[in-house]
């Protein structure tokens, strides 16, 4: 794994209508702590859905008007490559920062029940979008979550965003990495990789992009024609 992963559990979480306000507050605490630790680091805050990202942005705007630490940090990081960003699963592609704070959003409702519904993560391509989100950090990830990996129920053998989140949480909890994370493929990172990939395909080979484990990846891998489960 290329980046450090710090698991940050939310006290008294409450997930309701695609939002988790206690988790937003924990994200802000984590942000301020990181700024105090090293204000030179660039930071991205990302959530797994749009509604939570909007709530985080609103809370950040509110705190900026009353918290000197956060206001000074934002004021001193205004460049396109170092400004503080708040993004979601759909918009984070192409962005990178030293530190990424991730809000997983989902969690128990008012009755303490975690519904097995995970929005965009269960839709087609959810695992690829989540992989992009999880690999935006150059140095460190804070995984702010109201979930335990055991809260997420998946079908045996299924490779979906939900499975990917479960395995990532499990890795953060135990340090043990699953085959899902090791063998996950993604999309080419740039036009050069895409051109090379297309040229290889034109020669009759099957090829996957961004093979590997989170931040530790091989750009392109050609499948063995005699055994396509190997490269």
Q: Where do the PLM segments sit?
A:
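Short, glycine-/Ser/Thr-/acidic-enriched flexible segments
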Residues: 12-13, 50-52, 91, 106-108, ...
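Conserved helicase/translocase motor-coupling segment
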Residues: 1-61
């Amino acid at each position: 794994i290329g980046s450090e992963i710090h698991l940050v559990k939310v006290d008294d979480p409450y997930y309701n209508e695609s939002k988790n306000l206690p988790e937003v507050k924990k994200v802000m605490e984590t942000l301020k702590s990181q700024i105090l630790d090293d204000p030179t680091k660039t930071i991205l805050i990302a959530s797994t859905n749009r509604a939570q990202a909007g709530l985080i942005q609103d809370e950040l705007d509110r705190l900026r008007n009353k918290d000197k630490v956060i206001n000074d940090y934002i004021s001193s990081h205004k460049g396109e490559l170092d400004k503080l960003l708040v993004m979601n699963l759909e918009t984070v592609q192409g962005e990178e920062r030293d530190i990424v704070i991730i809000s997983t959003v989902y969690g128990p409702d008012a009755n303490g029940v975690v519904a097995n519904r995970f929005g965009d993560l269960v839709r087609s391509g959810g695992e690829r979008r989540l992989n992009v989100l999880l690999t935006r950090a150059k140095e460190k990830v804070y995984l702010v979550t109201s979930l335990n990996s055991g809260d997420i129920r998946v079908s045996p053998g299924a490779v979906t965003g939900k499975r990917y989140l479960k395995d990532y949480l499990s890795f953060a909890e135990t340090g043990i990495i699953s085959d899902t994370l090791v063998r996950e493929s993604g999309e080419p990172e740039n036009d050069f990789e895409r051109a090379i990939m297309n040229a290889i395909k034109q020669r009759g080979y099957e090829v996957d992009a961004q093979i590997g484990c989170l931040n530790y990846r091989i750009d392109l891998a050609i499948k063995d024609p005699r055994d396509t489960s190997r490269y």
